[in-house]
From Swiss-Prot:
Receptor for the attractant L-serine and related amino acids. Keywords: Cell inner membrane, Cell membrane, Chemotaxis, Membrane, Methylation, Transducer, Transmembrane, Transmembrane helix. The chain crosses the membrane at residues 10-30, 192-212. Pfam families: HAMP, MCPsignal, TarH. The modification Glutamate methyl ester (Glu) is found at residues 304, 493, 502. Belongs to the methyl-accepting chemotaxis (MCP) protein family. It is a multi-pass membrane protein. This is Methyl-accepting chemotaxis serine transducer. It is found in: Cell inner membrane.
C-alpha cells in the first residue's frame, strides 16, 4: 500500500499531521494562557482596588486624627493652655486629607468590579464610607463654627467601627477571590504541564511513525538506487534495476533503468566509434607524414624562388634609379638648351639693332658728304670771286682755299667712313643671318633634347612600374613562402593532432573498456594500444589547443 502513495502525498500528510498537532497544542496552550491572563487580571484588579481603598481608609483615619487634635486644641485654647499647631492649620490638614481620601475612593470606584465580587458588600462599603466621610466633614464644619459640644457628641467612633467592619469583610471577600485566582492559576499550570507531556508523547509517536514511513518509502528505495548508481559508476552495467513502486521513487528507478539501458547502447556505440576513429587516425597520421615531407620540399623551393626574386627586384630597382637619374640629366640639358636658345634670340635681336644703327650712321655720313661737297663748291665760288677782286681778295682766296682743302678732306673722310660703315652693315647682315641660323639650330636642339627628356621620362616611368610590379611579385612570392611555411607548420600540427587523436582514441577505448555489458559476460574488453611514433619534426613541434588547430586550418 505504501508503494502506491506518492512521496509528495506522504509529505503533505506529514505536514498536515504536524500542523494539526501544532494547532491542537497551540489551542491548549492558548486556553491555558487565556486562563492565566484572566487570573492575573483578577489579581491585578483586586490589588489595585485594595491599594486605593486602603489609601482612602488611611486618609480618613488621618483626617479624624487631625480633627481630634483640633478639638483638643480648641478646648486647650479655651482654657488658655494651648500650644503647638493652630486650629486652622489642623482643619486645613483635615480637609486636605478628606479630599485625598475622596480622590482615592473615586479612583477605586472607576476600577471595573470583578463579576465574582459581591455587589451588596461593595454597596455596603460605599454606604459606610459615605457615612464616615459625611461625619468627618460635619466635624470640620462644627469645629469651624465653635460648636465644641456638638463636635464631641457626634458618634464618629461608631461610624468608624462600622466602616472598619465593612472594610474587613470586603478584604476577606477579596482574599477569597485572590486565593481562587491563585488556585486557578496553579491548576492551569498543572494542566499546561500535562498537556505538554501528552503533546510530547504524541509528537514522539508521530515522529517514530513518520520516520518508519519515510524509511520504508524513501530511505530503503534510495539506498537501493545509490547501490545501483555506485555499480554504474564502477562500470558494472550487468545488474538489472527493479521498479517496485509507482511513486516518485518508482519514477526515479524507471529513469535510472532507462539511463542504464541508454548508457549500455552509448558505451557500445562509443567502443565501435573509438575503434573506427583509431583506424582512421592511424591512416591520417601516415598521410600527414607524407604531406609534411612534400610541404617541406615545396617550402624550400619557394624559399629559393623568393631569394631570386629579391635579387631581381634589387637589379630592377637599380635600373629604375639609373633611368630616373638619366631623365633628370636630360631634363637639365633641355633646360640649358632652352636657355641657350633664348640667348641666341637675344643676340639676333641685338645684331638687328646694330644693323639699324649702322644704317643710320651711313645716312648721317651721306649728309656730311653732301655738306662737304656744298662747302667745296662754296669755297670754289669764293676763290673765283677773290680772283676777280684782285689784290684785295687775296686773303679771302687763301681762306677759301683752306676751306676747300678742309671740305675735300672731309668729303674724303666721309667717303672712307661710309665705305667702312657699308662694309660693317654688310657684315652685320651676314652675322644676323648666321645668328638666325644658329637660333634655328638651337631650337632644333631644344626640341630634340625635349623629345629625349620625354623618352627618358617614359623609360623611368616604365622602370618604376616594372620595379613596382616586381616588388608585388616578390611580395606575392614572399607571401607564398610564408603561407607555405605556415602550411608546413600546419601539416606538422595536423600530424601531431592525428597522433594525439590516435592516442586519445586509444585512451577513449581504454576508458570505455571499464564498462561491463551483459553480452561480454566475464570477458574483459581489450582496447587497442597505439604503438606508432610521430616523426621527428612532429615530435619537436609544440602542442596547441583544438581552437588553435581550427584557426590555423582556416588560415590555410
Amino acid at each position: 500500500m505504501f508503494n502506491r502513495i506518492k512521496v509528495v502525498t506522504s509529505l503533505l500528510l506529514v505536514l498536515v499531521l504536524f500542523g494539526a498537532l501544532q494547532l491542537i497544542s497551540g489551542g491548549l496552550f492558548f486556553s491555558s494562557l487565556k486562563s492565566d491572563k484572566e487570573n492575573f487580571t483578577v489579581l491585578q484588579t483586586i490589588r489595585q482596588q485594595q491599594l486605593l481603598l486602603s489609601e482612602s481608609r488611611v486618609d480618613l483615619l488621618q483626617a479624624r486624627n487631625s480633627l481630634n487634635r483640633a478639638g483638643i486644641r480648641y478646648m486647650m485654647d479655651t482654657n488658655k493652655i494651648g500650644s503647638g499647631a493652630t486650629i486652622d492649620e489642623l482643619l486645613a490638614k483635615a480637609k486636605e486629607e478628606l479630599a485625598r481620601a475622596e480622590r482615592n475612593y473615586t479612583a477605586y470606584e472607576k476600577i471595573p468590579q470583578d463579576p465574582r465580587q459581591d455587589p451588596q458588600a461593595t454597596e455596603k462599603l460605599k454606604q459606610q464610607y459615605g457615612i464616615l466621610y459625611g461625619a468627618l466633614s460635619e466635624l470640620i464644619q462644627l469645629l469651624g463654627e465653635g460648636k465644641i459640644n456638638a463636635f464631641f457628641d457626634q458618634p464618629t467612633q461608631k461610624y468608624q467601627d462600622d466602616f472598619e467592619q465593612t472594610y474587613n469583610a470586603y478584604l476577606q471577600q477579596n482574599g477569597k477571590l485572590y486565593q481562587i485566582a491563585v488556585d486557578a492559576s496553579n491548576s492551569s499550570y498543572s494542566s499546561a504541564i500535562w498537556t505538554l507531556i501528552v503533546v510530547i508523547i504524541v509528537v514522539l509517536a508521530a515522529i517514530v511513525g513518520v520516520w518508519m514511513g519515510i524509511h520504508h518509502i524513501l530511505v530503503r528505495p534510495l539506498n537501493r538506487m545509490i547501490e545501483h548508481i555506485k555499480r554504474i559508476a564502477s562500470g558494472d552495467l550487468t545488474q538489472p534495476i527493479p521498479v517496485t513502486s509507482r511513486n516518485e521513487i518508482g519514477v526515479l528507478a524507471a529513469s535510472l533503468k532507462h539511463m542504464q539501458n541508454e548508457l549500455i547502447e552509448t558505451v557500445s556505440g562509443v567502443r565501435q566509434g573509438a575503434d573506427a576513429i583509431y583506424s582512421g587516425a592511424s591512416e591520417i597520421a601516415a598521410g600527414n607524414n607524407d604531406l609534411s615531407s612534400r610541404t617541406e620540399q615545396q617550402a624550400a623551393s619557394l624559399e629559393e624562388t623568393a631569394a631570386s626574386m629579391e635579387q631581381l627586384t634589387a637589379t630592377v630597382k637599380q635600373n629604375a634609379e639609373n633611368a630616373r637619374q638619366a631623365s633628370q640629366l636630360a631634363l637639365s640639358a633641355s633646360e640649358t638648351a632652352q636657355k641657350g636658345g633664348k640667348v641666341v634670340a637675344n643676340v639676333v635681336e641685338t645684331m638687328h639693332d646694330i644693323a639699324s644703327s649702322s644704317q643710320k650712321i651711313a645716312d648721317i655720313t651721306g649728309v656730311i658728304d653732301g655738306i662737304a661737297f656744298q662747302t667745296n663748291i662754296l669755297a670754289l665760288n669764293a676763290a673765283v670771286e677773290a680772283a676777280r677782286a684782285g689784290e684785295q681778295g687775296r686773303g679771302f682766296a687763301v681762306v677759301a682755299g683752306e676751306v676747300r682743302n678742309l671740305a675735300q678732306r672731309s668729303a674724303q673722310a666721309a667717303k672712307e667712313i661710309k665705305a667702312l660703315i657699308e662694309d660693317s652693315v654688310n657684315r652685320v647682315d651676314m652675322g644676323s643671318v648666321l645668328v638666325e641660323s644658329a637660333g634655328d639650330t638651337m631650337g632644333d636642339i631644344v626640341n630634340a633634347v625635349t623629345r629625349v627628356t620625354d623618352i627618358m621620362g617614359e623609360i623611368a616611368s616604365a622602370s618604376d612600374e616594372q620595379s613596382r610590379g616586381i616588388d608585388q611579385v616578390g611580395q606575392a612570392v614572399a607571401e607564398m613562402d610564408r603561407v607555405t611555411q605556415q602550411n608546413a607548420s600546419l601539416v606538422e600540427e595536423s600530424a601531431s593532432a592525428a597522433a594525439a587523436l590516435e592516442e586519445q582514441a586509444s585512451l577513449l577505448t581504454q576508458s570505455v573498456a571499464v564498462f561491463r555489458l551483459k553480452s561480454e559476460g566475464q570477458e574483459e574488453y581489450k582496447a587497442p594500444v597505439s604503438n606508432k611514433t610521430a616523426p621527428a619534426a612532429i615530435a619537436t613541434h609544440k602542442k596547441t589547443s583544438a581552437s588553435d588547430y581550427q584557426d590555423n586550418w582556416e588560415t590555410f
